[in-house]
Amino acid sequence: MTVRETRFPSSSATATQPDAVVRFCDTTLRDGEQAPGVAFTAAEKLAIAGALDAIGVHQIEAGIPGMGVTERDVLREILATDPKAEIVGWCRADHRDVEAAASCGLVTAHLTIPVSDLHLKSKLERDRAWARRRVRDCVVDGTDRGMRVSVGFEDASRADDAFVTDLAGELRDVGVTRLRWADTVGLLDPVSAYDRLGRLVRAVPGPWEIHAHDDFGLATANTIAAVQAGFTWVSTTVLGLGERAGNAPIEEVAMALRHLLKLPIDLDTTSFRTLAQLVVGWPLPAGKKAVVGESVFAHESGIHVHGILRHPATYEPFDPEVGGRRRLTVGKHSGRASLRHALEQCGITAEESELEPLVEQVRLAATRHKRGLDSRDLPGTSRAGRDAGPRAGTPTREEPV
């Protein structure tokens, strides 16, 4: 199997350096499928894994070997496609799970251990000493079986930082390839994330991964803060699919890293909308969804449309490179520039003196119908049909970029 290169920057490098490369571990097929009501068939898992591999994801957390025979069979099928991405099996810190992962032919396993006292005591009735022994023994078990092993610290945001730091150092010594810091219930904020995670990276150098949940709408922000603090891996899902409020969306994280932090992101971002449609179906669930939503490149305000027509960067932070299309809509907030442009697309040239009354008609019609106007109906506002006024519909003027 040809595995995509997963070398890491040196521990002295900060992720905000221009040459720093951030790696993606996508967990749509594991954490994403744990969202209530989500259940992928084997064929769907194969298709999604193939699409993630095609866009350049470095690791795909493809399932849970310990779930049973069916899950292990799907993992084997994914491995049989010979992906460039590393295929990872998610495991509890349990020798039975390690054995199950090895039986699939996986070369990479991810082990999870709770590190907060809340989880250890309330969920497992265990203590920190047990967690140390358990995860260390399972790491050794996995490496003895010839697997690359990473470890995730569950509920790290509510854990004692000193304990996490000590445990991380011990696990580095026994050969873990990477450590994952999980904000399991989304309690982190970007400022504390930058502070806490920066101290952690400095104390225990090496590859770290952030796994953020979106319970307070901060998963993407916390992921970006972690990268700024020195983390070199990010855990994501398509559209943020996941338990409760979900995870950090791959499309948001990738575009933020590329356009806000100016980091090299070696993913095919032009396929993000296609990937999202494959995972959740068509149409996409939210028009206002960041990066891939239907309304991300839609403009109605007269001031905005005027600016877009002169230079798209005036009101777009990035081009529709993710597979989207620019839409200039006509509605209540449209001005003369918007209407003139829409009419020109219909082959109509309006005199400047005609535009103002036509704009008023458009605004009245949009208010009455509570939606934008279809540019195909705008000829009804010309001299021949002005009395009828514009008809309401859906804004459909699209411009591929």
Swiss-Prot record:
Keyword field:
Nitrogen fixation, Transferase
This entry's Gene Ontology molecular function terms read:
homocitrate synthase activity
Q: Name one GO biological process term.
A: nitrogen fixation
Q: What reaction gets catalysed by this protein?
A: acetyl-CoA + 2-oxoglutarate + H2O = (2R)-homocitrate + CoA + H(+)
**Gene encoding this polypeptide?**
nifV
Its top-level enzyme class, in one word, is: transferase
* Annotated EC: 2.3.3.14
Q: Where are the annotated segments for Disordered?
A: 367-401
Pfam families per UniProt: HCS_D2 (PF22617), HMGL-like (PF00682)
What name has this protein been given in UniProt? Homocitrate synthase
Q: Which species does the entry assign this protein to?
A: Frankia sp. (strain FaC1)
Q: Which residues form the Pyruvate carboxyltransferase domain?
A: 22-271
- Give the UniProt family note: Belongs to the alpha-IPM synthase/homocitrate synthase family.
The record's section on NCBIfam families has:
nifV_homocitr
Q: What does this protein do?
A: This protein is a Fe-Mo-cofactor biosynthetic component.
